[in-house]
């Protein structure tokens, strides 16, 4: 039978509920090899008695030029501020609205959550990866609280909202220590410039 390998899996946080541990252990043991993108996930797997190693997040496996091949070749007819927000945060919502207003630009939101349709701005639900990248590439400014949103931004003025360790171990896994992470980012910090 074919081998089962999990590449760059994620637990989505830094811990699992005690009641879930036995089931998770049972499910993980179905795999011949497990690799995880966050160091906290490797720790969880190892604590469950399942060997795992940390690997590079898949977003970094392609060069910028490879990602760009996925972007549709069409013109953008308007200027906008783009928001890709994963975690509920009214302060971030208000900031995005005011930021777009201050810049005199339209506000666009990309989301996989249909309930985000009620937030301010034009809502784009679940765009395929090429469209997702097209919106990022054509944005005048990009606001996000997402690791993957940050990773796929290439030389674009952007803000990344700091999230808690529980919400996003990915950010912490990319830096050597939490102290370095804290020095490098603060809430709504400018992280890239053209």
Predicted regions: what is each one?
Residues 1-194:
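Active-site anion-handling motifs in enzyme catalytic cores
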